[in-house]
From Swiss-Prot:
The gene is recR. This is Recombination protein RecR. It comes from Natranaerobius thermophilus (strain ATCC BAA-1301 / DSM 18059 / JW/NM-WN-LF). Belongs to the RecR family. Residues 81-176 form the Toprim domain. GO terms for biological process: DNA recombination; DNA repair. One of its GO terms (molecular function) is DNA binding. Disulfide bonds: none annotated.
């Protein structure tokens, strides 16, 4: 244990709970916070508290929101027959930045991962099935990560939803813009070939 005062040690410990923050970074952040002026510290405290107390999952799509239903679910200009299925709320934000998708979302809150003990029953699939059957969904765009777990989840969704007459599509994956072909792995190249489009 360090010779720092107990409040600083507690702050370092609390900051190290955050993903990607090791002991040294937590220590640097703690000392930065201690040296900040009171207004900024109070703003940080309020932002942390509000994020924890006032942000919750939308009862329709499970996206993070501060009103229910969320603004995307309330937006009548969006195509309510089209749902993009994502792993978590950060994926919704990433897709929204592109400003190309005009449907609605459904956040699974994870992917099927037997290694981590996560099966279909651990995902938010019942609510998705209720939406498909109750809202007249015609297409499901599966936008899970291009990982073994993401692919397994996409295949499971396809098997689950296809019998209901819903079109199931998957985002195309492949080479990134500006990427060098020689550095691409085999799976990326394979998916790039499979997802090729006519010019």
């Amino acid at each position: 244990m360090s010779n720092y005062p107990k409040p600083i040690n507690r702050l370092i410990e609390a900051l190290s709970y955050l993903p990607g923050i090791g002991p040294k970074t937590a220590e640097r952040l703690a000392f930065h916070i201690v040296s900040m002026d009171e207004t900024k510290v109070n703003h940080l405290i309020t932002a942390l508290q509000d994020s924890r107390d006032k942000v919750f999952e939308c009862s329709t799509c499970n996206n993070l929101t501060d009103k229910d239903p969320c603004t995307i679910c309330q937006d009548e200009s969006r195509d309510s027959n089209l749902i993009c299925v994502v792993q978590d709320a950060r994926d919704v934000t990433a897709i929204e930045k592109v400003q190309d998708f005009q449907g609605k979302y459904h956040v699974l809150q994870g992917v099927i991962s037997p290694m981590e003990g996560i099966g279909p029953d651990d995902l938010n699939l019942k609510a998705l099935m209720d939406r498909i059957q109750g809202e007249g969904i015609t297409e499901l765009v599966v936008a899970t990560d291009p990982t073994v777990e993401g692919e397994a989840t996409a295949m499971y969704l396809n098997k689950l939803v296809k019998p209901l007459g819903v079109r199931v599509t998957r985002l195309a994956y492949g080479l990134p813009m500006g990427g060098d072909l020689e550095y691409a792995d085999e799976m990326t190249l394979q998916q790039a070939f499979e997802g090729r489009k006519e010019l």
